[in-house]
Structures are given as structure tokens and as C-alpha cells.
């Protein structure tokens, strides 16, 4: 099953076989020498060109390839290691460990292209996924097996939220996480690894990186590498897994780069004509089955802040919840800097989460919205010109804003204050009390960077005594 290279077009390689035609998605191997150094390269068949010729996408740099070099067909797809052994390790797109530790000897390998769960296998229950982060659980709750878009610019705390979620899943739900860095900056991937090591969550997460400097094939397929590892924990171990993709925009972008080289005519804004289908292929595999679930959190970069751009627009159709991070909130020193009015969730309805939760959440949003509307008046005339009713709303809104902040476990190293996991019950109890005016007598500083309402009362007491 040997062939030879007949053409190299950047990351796309055409190969001719004599009597064998490899299937679409089959892996091909090339071993070659560059300046006296032995190199191996994996290709993946993307198109049949007629005759016994195929067009394949390279999973690494193609420097040093020449025509007539020997190519071996594997007879199977790219396969990656799965199982407990992948935890705490970093992998590239073809499942090789790249963390300079001992090479992994996997007991199990799975192909990266797999069918999405069928209708019969999918779970139809909608269950809330408790994160222990007050602002998310109250105002934009995640659902088990749901998909969440994490929107935010640089430096507002996307990575910290991702790490806290990994921590809480590991320690409260006893679950595992998989992180796929799709078109990541190498520096960010490196930082994440060491921050997780310091935060003590590394042994509960598998990391897969296809960095920004790699060819589009590697950046595109790395999402499937990570997803395959997550599917093993869901299907074979019956676990609820958390899957992080950073950044889903770059998955679409790498697809566009490959599409042009494969000779497809581009569609709107230069994207691949198959954009919606490719996005669906990835997203449909992220689902809850009767065994377990994969809940995914996907960072979404929005090019030029244009939400109608085809790439982010193709993601929106699949999302169940959005968590929007706001720089203005971060500047106030409120972390996590989640925007309570911009973040949304499909399950925020009385049928899904119950009347009580729904009433408290909408009550909180109304108070915050009213405060936002009053800010212009406050800026021009000052607080004293407001009616007594409005003054009360402003006071409560400021307490709510402060109470939406929370110390994180993974930030303990930097802040010195111990992290807090707040159950949904405690969250609802605290915010209901603020809405009902139970805590109108407590100074707003007592609400800042604490967990449950119990801690607010203790903090207020110690502030009074001191």
C-alpha cells in the first residue's frame, strides 16, 4: 500500500498509488530526511482526484518533501490514545505527547473521526449543571451536555474561569476535563499548563494543542483529537466530562484555509462553502447520552466585533448558553467579570429550572437594569436627587454587583483569599434576601469577594467590631 508524492502545495500534498485507493480520512505516513535529520509526517486523505490519486492534508510542516517520495497508507484513520493515562499530559493532533515527559504507552487508541450519538442513544433530560460560580448558576445556568459560548477580549479572565470550572468539576463532581487549544498562542498554552500545575488541577485534565504556528490541518483536527478523548470518558466510563475549546473561531478559520487549497470555491467573506456542515459535524458529537455527558465551554473570538460574521454566526446556532465577560466590570475589581445582563441561557425558564429560581434571577436582572438606566441621572445630578424608591434600588443593585463577585480556588495563589464553591441553594437564598430587603442594613463592602450570604453576615459583624 505504497504510493508516491506527485505534488506539494504548502500544507496540501497530492499522492498517487498504483493499485490501491485510500479512503477519505485515511492516514498516510511519510518518513524522510531533512539536513541529516529523520522526520516523519502524517497526512489525512481529503479528496479523490480521479485515477488512484488523492489530495491529502498535512498534520505538520511540509518542508523537505519532494516529488516521488514514498508514502505509506495506514489502512485506517488517525488514532489517538484514550483512557486515564492521558490525564495530566499534553498531546498534538496525532496523539503524540509533546510535554517532554516519558512517551505514553497507550493501552487504548480510538480513531478521531467518529459518528455522533444516534437519536436512541441521546438523553432527552434537561438537567442543570451546577458550577459553584454564583453569577453563572443564578443568571445564565449551564445544562448538562449543553454548549456554552465564552465571549471576552484579552485579559478579562477567560482562562481563570476555564481553570475554575476544571477545578470544580474535578473536586465537586469527581469528573474529568479535556482542553483543546485550537489555533492557540504557544505562550498561552504554556501558561495554562503551568497555571494548572500550580492550581493543582493538572491530574484531572487532558490537554491537546494545535498551535497558531502549525498548518491548518493540525489546527482543524485538534478539536477532534480532544473530543475523542472526552467521548471515551463519557461512553466507556459513564462520566460527565467538561470539554473546553479555545478558540472555536480558529476551527472555522483553519477550515477556510484548507478549503481554498483543496480547490473549493469560497462562499461569503471567503469562508469555506462547507462551514455550517463542518461546524455541525463537531458540535453534534458534543452531546449527552444515556451513559454520561459532555458539557462544552467554547471560547468565541468575534472578528471586528461583528456577530453576523459567518464563523461566529455558525457557532450561535449550536449554543445553549452564553457567558459574556465585560472589561468594565473587571475594571471595577469584580471577578469573575461576567456581564449579568448580557449573558444568556436557554434553560432560564420556569419549566426548566423551577419558578423560585426563575423569579429570583429575573428579579436580580430587573434591579440591575434599573440601576443601569439610572446611571446617567446619577452622573449629572448625583444620588441625592433620586426618589427614596430609586435610592433603595441603587443600594441593592450595588450590593448585588458586589455579591456576584467570588474568590476562586485557582486564584488563591495570587489573591491569598481561599476559594469558595457556592451551591445553588445558597446562591438563591442570598440573592432572594437582598431582593426582599433583608440585608438593607448591611454595608455593601461586606458583600465583596465572599461565598454564601452567611459569610456576608460574618464579615459585616467583624467590620462592625473593628
Swiss-Prot record:
- EC code(s) of this entry: 7.1.2.2
Family per record: Belongs to the ATPase alpha/beta chains family.
- Tell where it localizes: Cell inner membrane
Assembly description? F-type ATPases have 2 components, CF(1) - the catalytic core - and CF(0) - the membrane proton channel. CF(1) has five subunits: alpha(3), beta(3), gamma(1), delta(1), epsilon(1). CF(0) has three main subunits: a(1), b(2) and c(9-12). The alpha and beta chains form an alternating ring which encloses part of the gamma chain. CF(1) is attached to CF(0) by a central stalk formed by the gamma and epsilon chains, while a peripheral stalk is formed by the delta and b chains.
Q: Which UniProt keywords apply?
A: ATP synthesis, ATP-binding, Cell inner membrane, Cell membrane, CF(1), Hydrogen ion transport, Ion transport, Membrane, Nucleotide-binding, Translocase, Transport
First-level EC class:
translocase
Q: How does it sit in the membrane?
A: Peripheral membrane protein
**Record's catalysed reaction(s):** ATP + H2O + 4 H(+)(in) = ADP + phosphate + 5 H(+)(out)
Pfam families reported for this sequence: ATP-synt_ab (PF00006), ATP-synt_ab_N (PF02874), ATP-synt_VA_C (PF22919)
Binding-site residues for ATP, renumbered to this chain: 152-159
**What is the designated name of this protein?**
ATP synthase subunit beta
* Natural source organism: Helicobacter acinonychis (strain Sheeba)
Q: Which InterPro entries match?
A: AAA+_ATPase, ATP-synt_VA_C, ATP_synth_F1_bsu, ATPase_a/bsu_AS, ATPase_alpha/beta_chains, ATPase_F1/V1/A1_a/bsu_N, ATPase_F1/V1/A1_a/bsu_N_sf, ATPase_F1/V1/A1_a/bsu_nucl-bd
Q: What does this protein do?
A: Produces ATP from ADP in the presence of a proton gradient across the membrane. The catalytic sites are hosted primarily by the beta subunits.
GO MF annotations, alphabetized: ATP binding; ATP hydrolysis activity; proton-transporting ATP synthase activity, rotational mechanism
Q: Name one GO cellular component term.
A: proton-transporting ATP synthase complex
Amino acid at each position: 500500500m505504497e504510493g508516491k508524492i506527485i505534488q506539494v502545495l504548502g500544507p496540501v500534498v497530492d499522492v498517487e498509488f498504483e493499485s490501491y485507493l485510500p479512503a477519505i480520512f485515511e492516514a498516510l505516513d511519510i518518513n524522510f530526511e531533512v539536513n541529516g535529520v529523520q522526520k516523519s509526517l502524517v497526512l489525512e486523505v481529503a479528496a479523490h482526484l480521479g485515477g488512484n490519486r488523492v489530495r491529502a492534508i498535512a498534520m505538520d510542516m511540509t518542508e523537505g518533501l519532494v516529488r516521488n517520495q514514498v508514502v505509506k497508507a495506514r489502512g485506517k484513520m488517525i488514532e489517538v490514545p484514550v483512557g486515564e493515562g492521558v490525564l495530566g499530559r499534553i498531546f498534538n493532533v496525532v496523539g503524540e505527547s509533546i510535554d517532554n515527559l516519558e512517551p505514553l504507552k497507550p493501552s487504548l487508541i480510538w480513531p478521531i473521526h467518529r459518528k455522533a450519538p444516534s437519536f436512541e442513544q441521546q438523553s432527552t433530560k434537561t438537567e442543570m449543571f451546577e458550577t459553584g460560580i454564583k453569577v453563572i448558576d443564578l443568571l445564565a445556568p449551564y445544562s448538562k451536555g449543553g454548549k456554552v459560548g465564552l465571549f471576552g477580549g484579552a485579559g478579562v479572565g477567560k482562562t481563570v474561569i476555564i481553570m475554575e470550572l476544571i477545578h470544580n468539576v474535578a473536586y465537586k463532581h469527581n469528573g474529568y476535563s479535556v482542553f483543546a487549544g485550537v489555533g492557540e498562542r504557544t505562550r498561552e498554552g504554556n501558561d495554562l499548563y503551568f497555571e494548572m500545575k500550580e492550581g493543582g488541577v493538572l491530574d484531572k485534565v487532558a490537554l491537546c494543542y494545535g498551535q497558531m504556528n502549525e498548518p491548518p490541518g493540525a489546527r482543524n483536527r485538534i478539536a477532534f483529537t480532544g473530543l475523542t478523548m472526552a467521548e471515551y470518558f463519557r461512553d466507556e466510563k459513564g462520566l460527565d466530562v467538561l470539554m473546553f475549546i479555545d478558540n472555536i473561531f480558529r476551527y472555522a478559520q483553519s477550515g477556510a484555509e484548507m478549503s481554498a487549497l483543496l480547490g473549493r470555491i469560497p462562499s461569503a467573506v471567503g469562508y469555506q462553502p462547507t462551514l455550517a456542515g463542518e461546524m455541525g459535524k463537531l458540535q453534534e458529537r458534543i452531546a449527552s447520552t444515556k451513559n454520561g455527558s459532555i458539557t462544552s465551554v467554547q471560547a468565541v473570538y468575534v472578528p471586528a466585533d461583528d456577530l453576523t460574521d459567518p464563523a461566529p454566526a455558525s457557532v450561535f446556532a449550536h449554543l445553549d448558553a452564553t457567558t459574556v465577560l465585560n472589561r468594565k466590570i473587571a475594571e471595577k475589581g469584580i471577578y469573575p467579570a461576567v456581564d449579568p445582563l448580557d449573558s444568556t441561557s436557554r434553560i432560564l425558564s420556569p419549566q426548566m429550572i423551577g419558578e423560585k429560581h426563575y423569579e429570583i434571577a429575573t428579579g436580580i436582572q430587573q434591579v440591575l437594569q434599573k440601576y443601569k438606566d439610572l446611571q446617567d441621572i446619577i452622573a449629572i445630578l448625583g444620588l441625592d436627587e433620586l426618589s427614596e424608591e430609586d435610592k433603595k434600588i441603587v443600594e441593592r443593585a450595588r450590593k448585588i454587583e458586589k455579591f456576584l463577585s467570588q474568590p476562586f480556588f485557582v486564584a488563591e495563589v495570587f489573591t491569598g483569599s481561599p476559594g469558595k464553591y457556592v451551591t445553588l441553594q445558597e446562591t438563591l437564598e442570598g440573592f432572594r434576601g437582598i431582593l426582599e430587603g433583608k440585608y438593607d442594613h448591611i454595608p455593601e463592602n461586606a458583600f465583596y469577594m465572599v461565598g454564601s450570604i452567611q459569610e456576608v453576615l460574618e464579615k459585616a459583624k467583624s467590620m462592625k467590631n473593628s
